[in-house]
Amino acid sequence: MNKPVLVSFLVSGDPNPDATLKFMKTLDKYSGVIELGIPFSDPVADGPTIQAADVRALSNGFKIAKSFEVLKEFRKESNTPVILMTYYNPVYKRGIENFVISAKEAGANGLVIVDLPLQEATEYREICKKHEMGTVFLAAPNTPEDRLKTSDEASTEFLYLISTFGITGARESFEQMTFDFIKRARTTCKGKICVGFGISKGSHAESLIEQGADGVIVGSAFVDIIKNYGDSEEALVKLEELAKELSEGIEKGYEKRK
């Protein structure tokens, strides 16, 4: 991940596992990383768009093993890094080591457990290190300097910068606070920093990359397309159009930085 990249997020099993695989292959053309969300019944960090996607997947009988199967299929055709996003409860229920081994065998490059604070993640980090599984932690605009530094050090893939306070979901534009946060993280962090929450168009990607981000994480905007078009050819066309627009925005932002 040398040039800035698009990190594309999808909810696994929304609306069904076969569709997820098709969506992953479509987004792969423009994505440097794919983030695959494991549906959960109480996704506290997610806004209504992703919550609704979780409900759609779960109501269709989604099981975690299906995420691993989809990823195994994807791995037959692509080496693009895949990060699995989940909450702590499903990991704990399966057993941390069991979950990490299953994810590794399926072809995952890293994990982000949204509601697992760094100070409670010692065992999890040790298990990930043992099985060569990457880790991603989160930081918010109000994260103090020392925590930002330790979160960066604990994140082997990239540090996930939350662009603003609150939950996921598309928004119109970004405040100066977000740009200041990226600059602060750029100064403090030695690893890669990717920005998520609220990014839905090329101009967003351009402005965030221009400020120094290594990647933009886009979820709700893709999930909205899936909500509206379901498992259809039109969904694939719309997903590719948006991914292309975001990718071009990233390129423009990177050019402005030079």
Swiss-Prot record:
Can you tell which superkingdom this protein's organism belongs to? Answer: Archaea
Pathway(s)? Amino-acid biosynthesis; L-tryptophan biosynthesis; L-tryptophan from chorismate: step 5/5
- Give the residues annotated as active site: E35, D46
Pfam families named among the record's database cross-references? Trp_syntA (PF00290)
Q: Catalytic activity annotated for this protein?
A: (1S,2R)-1-C-(indol-3-yl)glycerol 3-phosphate + L-serine = D-glyceraldehyde 3-phosphate + L-tryptophan + H2O
Q: Which GO terms describe its molecular function?
A: tryptophan synthase activity
Q: Which UniProt keywords apply?
A: Amino-acid biosynthesis, Aromatic amino acid biosynthesis, Lyase, Tryptophan biosynthesis
Matches recorded under InterPro entries: Aldolase_TIM (IPR013785), RibuloseP-bd_barrel (IPR011060), Trp_synthase_alpha_AS (IPR018204), Trp_synthase_suA (IPR002028)
Family in the record: Belongs to the TrpA family.
| Chain's role | The alpha subunit is responsible for the aldol cleavage of indoleglycerol phosphate to indole and glyceraldehyde 3-phosphate.
What HAMAP family does this protein map onto?
Trp_synth_alpha
Protein's UniProt name: Tryptophan synthase alpha chain
